[in-house]
């Protein structure tokens, strides 16, 4: 059971990294970042249940990470929406708001 969970978590994390490095769309990049966090959560819960099945520290920490990821997604989507209103594009290569 541990091996399957670790393989699934690593697969999700690698898929997120691949999508983050190849994506030109900000929303797709944000979704890939969330995918990476979900892969980390799966590995965290798998290790927690394997090492100490009586305590739920890993599960509590995973729920905390999910809450932080939800806040990060809301803030990220608000920033992307603001950029789209100003630039009419959400492509990462056209994102140069911080340049003089």
UniProtKB/Swiss-Prot annotation:
Q: Supply one GO CC term from the record.
A: chloroplast thylakoid membrane
Listed Pfam families: Oxidored_q2
Q: Which domain of life is it from?
A: Eukaryota
Which GO BP terms sit in this record?
A: ATP synthesis coupled electron transport; photosynthesis, light reaction
Q: Where in the cell is it found?
A: Plastid, Chloroplast thylakoid membrane
Q: Which residues cross the membrane?
A: 1-21, 30-50, 60-80
EC annotation from Swiss-Prot or TrEMBL: 7.1.1.-
> What InterPro entries does this protein map onto?
NADH_UbQ_OxRdtase_chain4L/K (IPR001133), NUOK/Mnh_C1-like (IPR039428)
Q: Which intervals of the chain form a coiled coil? A: none
Q: Record's Gene3D superfamilies?
A: 1.10.287.3510
The yes or no answer to whether the keyword 4Fe-4S is present is no
Membrane association type:
Multi-pass membrane protein
The molecular function terms in GO held by this entry are:
oxidoreductase activity, acting on NAD(P)H, quinone or similar compound as acceptor; quinone binding
Catalysed reaction(s) here are: a plastoquinone + NADH + (n+1) H(+)(in) = a plastoquinol + NAD(+) + n H(+)(out); a plastoquinone + NADPH + (n+1) H(+)(in) = a plastoquinol + NADP(+) + n H(+)(out)
Which UniProt keywords are present, listed alphabetically? Chloroplast, Membrane, NAD, NADP, Plastid, Plastoquinone, Quinone, Thylakoid, Translocase, Transmembrane, Transmembrane helix, Transport
> What family is this protein classified in?
Belongs to the complex I subunit 4L family.
Entry-linked HAMAP family: NDH1_NuoK
Give the protein's biological function: NDH shuttles electrons from NAD(P)H:plastoquinone, via FMN and iron-sulfur (Fe-S) centers, to quinones in the photosynthetic chain and possibly in a chloroplast respiratory chain. The immediate electron acceptor for the enzyme in this species is believed to be plastoquinone. Couples the redox reaction to proton translocation, and thus conserves the redox energy in a proton gradient.
Q: How does it assemble?
A: NDH is composed of at least 16 different subunits, 5 of which are encoded in the nucleus.
Official protein name in the record:
NAD(P)H-quinone oxidoreductase subunit 4L, chloroplastic
Question: What is the organism field in this record?
Answer: Staurastrum punctulatum (Green alga)
Provide the gene name from the record. ndhE
